[in-house]
C-alpha cells in the first residue's frame, strides 16, 4: 500500500456541508479494496488561478489515503465522471 493525497475541486454552487458526504460514497471504492482513508479536509470555497469549466472559484477538498495504485486510479476515474467535480489531482507525498 502506498500513501496518496488527492486534491478535489468541486462546483462552487454546491453547499459546503454536503461535500464530505458526497465524497464519502466514492471513498467506499478505497475501503472496499482494503485501503484506508486517513482524513478528508474540506478547505472551503477558494478562488481558482484561472477559470476551469467556466468557474472562477471552487470548493477544495484534500483526501489523504493509503491504497494500491490500481485502486487509486479507479477512484480518480469515478471522481472525474461526476459533473459536480471540476478537477482532481492525485499526488504521492515524498515520492522521490
Swiss-Prot record:
GO terms for biological process: translation. Disulfide bonds: none annotated. Keywords: Ribonucleoprotein, Ribosomal protein, RNA-binding, rRNA-binding. One of its GO terms (cellular component) is ribosome. It comes from the Bacteria. InterPro entries: Ribosomal_bS6 (IPR000529), Ribosomal_bS6_sf (IPR035980), Ribosomal_S6_plastid/chlpt (IPR020814), Transl_elong_EF1B/ribsomal_bS6 (IPR014717). GO terms for molecular function: small ribosomal subunit rRNA binding; structural constituent of ribosome. Belongs to the bacterial ribosomal protein bS6 family. Binds together with bS18 to 16S ribosomal RNA. This is Small ribosomal subunit protein bS6. It comes from Nocardioides sp. (strain ATCC BAA-499 / JS614). The lineage of its organism: Bacteria, Bacillati, Actinomycetota, Actinomycetes, Propionibacteriales.
Amino acid at each position: 500500500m502506498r500513501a496518496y493525497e488527492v486534491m478535489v475541486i468541486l462546483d462552487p454552487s454546491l453547499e459546503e456541508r454536503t461535500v464530505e458526504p458526497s465524497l464519502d460514497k466514492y471513498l467506499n471504492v478505497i475501503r472496499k479494496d482494503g485501503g484506508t482513508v486517513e482524513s478528508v479536509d474540506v478547505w472551503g470555497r477558494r478562488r481558482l488561478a484561472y477559470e476551469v469549466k467556466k468557474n472562477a472559484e471552487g470548493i477544495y477538498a484534500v483526501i489523504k489515503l493509503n491504497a494500491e495504485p490500481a485502486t487509486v486510479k479507479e477512484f480518480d476515474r469515478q471522481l472525474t465522471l461526476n459533473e459536480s467535480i471540476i478537477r482532481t489531482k492525485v499526488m504521492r507525498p515524498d515520492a522521490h
